[in-house]
Amino acid sequence: MEFVYDVAESAVSPAVIKVIGLGGGGCNAINNMVANNVRGVEFISANTDAQSLAKNHAAKRIQLGTNLTRGLGAGANPDIGRAAAQEDREAIEEAIRGANMLFITTGMGGGTGTGSAPVVAEIAKSLGILTVAVVTRPFAYEGKRVHVAQAGLEQLKEHVDSLIIIPNDKLMTALGEDVTMREAFRAADNVLRDAVAGISEVVTCPSEIINLDFADVKTVMSNRGIAMMGSGYAQGIDRARMATDQAISSPLLDDVTLDGARGVLVNITTAPGCLKMSELSEVMKIVNQSAHPDLECKFGAAEDETMSEDAIRITIIATGLKEKGAVDFVPAREVEAVAPSKQEQSHNVEGMIRTNRGIRTMNLTAADFDNQSVLDDFEIPAILRRQHNSDK
């Protein structure tokens, strides 16, 4: 077993997280995050519609395709949106340069967002930036926009590390038939807000500059494809289970679950000194129930002085998920291999407990999981993988 204790130095720079909103929907999402005081990130808005962009609250604003569109928008044509982004490629590159992680948000199916998102993602990847897109999909009754959105999604997938899709059709199902349009779209924006805030909380400490190993975040989210994100909050007895159930059961995401997840990032936040080892164990057991045998799981525990002592907040981001109807590809040589026994299988799990003093990291081998004395020596909960629905 490897045990490392690092004391963070105040001179260490935290990871730089930027969020860029594209088109009308993406720019509205930026306004929502600014209004909700999401900290630790830099906001950028880019649009072909000059009038709409002028009203945006992002610190950095980019007018796309001034020569092409004259500030009048892309007219729901993604080809124009793409060309506009190419016209201002240098401005986009300058705005996102220096980021360790970039969130791209937009509403797919229109002109500016659908066309420019793949361009922005391609630029980000060329700069070595961890790139995650959080996008909405049109209502099924929107006809042509649905097909335009799907074509845009296929292009976007080629360049992003992880992709979170929020279908508009889920909004009424999840929120009820009486929900207003404003409330529904705000709920969709909040998925992005929670994802950004959750990652920011994992990577930075508000009271002291502590940079949790950003390489761990990259391990979970790099080149992983479809992803899901959820956040849960609970108080009182059984708070850990209730918050975890909320986090993994987001009704707004696109028919994805933790089943078969290959990468999971878990962040647990409580008041100082209020997280129990048994709660940490319970959270991780729930997460591991449906995971892939080769799961990469990273978890952090943060302390927030503003939270009550009986409260807990849990953020979970799972990556490497299958889309609805997708089937895993299994190479022929793997079919002939002898499957390891249940006792031999283990997950690569790293734990990081963050306090105002520093970071404690522990790496467990497969043998360590079967050696209770090793776990007891370091007061680590027995986080054991449970095979779920093995016949599936």
From Swiss-Prot:
Subcellular location: Cytoplasm
Record's keyword annotation contains Cell division: yes
GTP-binding recorded as keyword: yes
GO biological process: cell division; division septum assembly; FtsZ-dependent cytokinesis; protein polymerization
Superkingdom, natural source: Bacteria
Family annotation (Pfam families): FtsZ_C, Tubulin
Record-level GO cellular component terms: cell division site; cytoplasm
Binding site for GTP: G24, G25, G26, C27, N28, G111, T112, G113, E142, R145, D189
GO molecular function: GTP binding; GTPase activity
InterPro entries cross-referenced by the UniProt entry: Cell_div_FtsZ, Cell_div_FtsZ_CS, FtsZ/CetZ, FtsZ_C, Tub_FtsZ_C, Tubulin/FtsZ-like_C, Tubulin/FtsZ_2-layer-sand-dom, Tubulin/FtsZ_GTPase_sf
PROSITE patterns per UniProt: FTSZ_1, FTSZ_2
Keywords, alphabetical: Cell cycle, Cell division, Cytoplasm, GTP-binding, Nucleotide-binding, Septation
Assembly and oligomerization: Homodimer. Polymerizes to form a dynamic ring structure in a strictly GTP-dependent manner. Interacts directly with several other division proteins.
Protein's job: Essential cell division protein that forms a contractile ring structure (Z ring) at the future cell division site. The regulation of the ring assembly controls the timing and the location of cell division. One of the functions of the FtsZ ring is to recruit other cell division proteins to the septum to produce a new cell wall between the dividing cells. Binds GTP and shows GTPase activity.
Family label: Belongs to the FtsZ family.
Name assigned to this protein: Cell division protein FtsZ
Originating species: Neisseria meningitidis serogroup B (strain ATCC BAA-335 / MC58)
Primary gene name: ftsZ
